[in-house]
Amino acid sequence: MPKKDIQPKYFEEAKFICTTCANEFICGTTKREEMRIDVCSNCHPFFSGAQNFANTTGRVEQFKSKFARKEAINATAQKNSEDQKSKNKENK
């Protein structure tokens, strides 16, 4: 005998909203009534045939900018350290 009420709730008319082109369509899902997606078939290059980029500042770009700032700070700290070492040698 199968257990009762173990299946997830199914939303037959869930609203999907594309965050890139603001296209909306209705489809069934078990997640939630309104879903936001990054790319849909309306704006995806495979389906549209155009090579346009959706989000230019994604996670990778944010990581690269954060890493570049860290490298700049490390370079400044290294330079200050070398300057301090040279001053210490002069004072001896």
UniProtKB/Swiss-Prot annotation:
It comes from Mesoplasma florum (strain ATCC 33453 / NBRC 100688 / NCTC 11704 / L1) (Acholeplasma florum). GO terms for molecular function: rRNA binding; structural constituent of ribosome. One of its GO terms (biological process) is translation. Part of the 50S ribosomal subunit. InterPro entries: Ribosomal_bL28/bL31-like_sf (IPR034704), Ribosomal_bL31 (IPR002150), Ribosomal_bL31_A (IPR027491), Ribosomal_bL31_sf (IPR042105). This is Large ribosomal subunit protein bL31. Transmembrane segments: none annotated. Belongs to the bacterial ribosomal protein bL31 family. Type A subfamily. The gene is rpmE. Binds the 23S rRNA. Keywords: Ribonucleoprotein, Ribosomal protein, RNA-binding, rRNA-binding.
